[in-house]
């Protein structure tokens, strides 16, 4: 859990977190372990507060996505022990091999299940006119708007590393009390992306 690793490096970590979560600062964190979502929201919110956009040169959520993509697809994270490194890189290196739009988005939908035991990511339609895909997260409530945006940023950054250019936009958000989260992904026009978009059931403009 990189969020905990980052918080452990801060001398003020115990000030940032409620005492009930200090255990994460004292105990080893297993990359393959499952942790309560309610704890994760508190942890990541605390970490975001420590990141100054002027210092890091971008929005903190965009920074998380860029860091994760470079670490996970590249498999480079010296903070992980060898077994953890192998487990982390295995998931994402498979993702890195998905260089065609259909395999890329299929991998993106499967990736959600790697880290969450509830909710499912679905590709619900496309718009040929704008070369856009629409994805939804069903059955899972994300309470933080930045974390909703982060899911779109992840795909933008993973796409950059494997040659698929896209721009994400949040259109529905459970953080805004919508019943589900939804993203539009506008793909750069290439023969491959246009063919893929046309192959998906079309939505109204």
PLM segments and residue spans:
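Amphipathic interaction/junction segments at domain boundaries or subunit interfaces
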Residues: 32-150, 172
């Amino acid at each position: 859990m990189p969020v905990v690793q980052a918080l452990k490096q801060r001398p003020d970590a115990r000030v940032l977190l409620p005492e009930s979560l200090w255990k994460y600062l004292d105990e080893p964190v297993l990359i393959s372990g499952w942790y309560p979502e309610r704890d994760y929201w508190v942890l990541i919110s605390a970490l975001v507060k420590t990141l100054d956009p002027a210092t890091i040169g971008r929005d903190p959520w965009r920074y998380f996505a860029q860091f994760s993509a470079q670490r996970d697809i590249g498999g480079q994270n010296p903070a992980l022990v060898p077994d953890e490194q192998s487990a982390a890189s295995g998931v994402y290196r498979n993702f890195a091999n998905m260089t065609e739009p259909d395999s890329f988005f299929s991998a993106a939908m499967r990736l959600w299940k790697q880290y969450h035991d509830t909710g499912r990511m679905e590709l619900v339609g496309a718009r040929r006119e704008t070369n856009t895909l629409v994805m939804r997260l069903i059955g899972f409530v994300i309470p933080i708007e930045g974390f909703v945006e982060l899911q779109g940023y992840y795909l933008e950054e993973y796409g950059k590393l494997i040659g698929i250019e896209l721009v994400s936009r949040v259109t529905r958000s459970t953080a805004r009390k919508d019943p589900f989260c939804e993203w539009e992904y506008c793909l750069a026009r290439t023969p491959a992306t246009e063919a893929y978009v046309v192959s998906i059931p079309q939505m109204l403009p």
